[in-house]
Amino acid sequence: MSRIAKYPVELPKGVEANIQQDQITVKGPLGTLSQALTGDVTVALDNGKLTFVAANESRHAGAMSGTVRALVANMVTGVSKGFERKLTLVGVGYRAQVQGDAVKLQLGFSHDIVHKLPAGVKAECPTQTEIVIKGSNKQVVGQVAAELRAYREPEPYKGKGVRYADERVVIKETKKK
């Protein structure tokens, strides 16, 4: 059995979980999220706690019980507190601004990049060189941040590009003659 699945997931105040045959739905103040369940994992709700047990003794069932527990724990956190990812733009003339449900980036190309945000994800720009992506689904928030970073990844000689706020870019030394 997975060591992660041993610990139950507690539902905070204002969060409800609904378990069907092959799906779990978590509803909270920041929205509703659903996750498909495999037949290898049995989920039970009692006294505001979700418990996860492998349905059989196979190695795959034990691994999946930990995976499902981690995904559901992220869902509970997402609908109660939410997730955010911060990006920083480093470079001369690099700017970002939010236009409705899209982020407009100026990253040194001959054209501006307009990245449309998926449903359930919001972005804000506290300054011209910072982007904060917020949402209830951790996977979607991380995916949007990765897509924005992919437009201009930090280059290793000057460090210019779009980077995560907590990312450290190792600067290489240039060639000497």
From Swiss-Prot:
Annotated GO MF terms: rRNA binding; structural constituent of ribosome
GO CC terms in record: cytosolic large ribosomal subunit
Keyword annotations from UniProtKB, A to Z: Ribonucleoprotein, Ribosomal protein, RNA-binding, rRNA-binding
The organism's place on the tree of life at top rank: Bacteria
UniProt record, GO biological process: cytoplasmic translation
One Pfam family recorded for the sequence: Ribosomal_L6
PANTHER family with a match to the protein in the record: 60S/50S RIBOSOMAL PROTEIN L6/L9, LARGE RIBOSOMAL SUBUNIT PROTEIN UL6M
Subunit structure, as described in the record: Part of the 50S ribosomal subunit.
HAMAP family: Ribosomal_uL6_B (MF_01365_B)
Record family assignment: Belongs to the universal ribosomal protein uL6 family.
Function: This protein binds to the 23S rRNA, and is important in its secondary structure. It is located near the subunit interface in the base of the L7/L12 stalk, and near the tRNA binding site of the peptidyltransferase center.
Protein name per its UniProtKB record: Large ribosomal subunit protein uL6
Gene name of the record: rplF
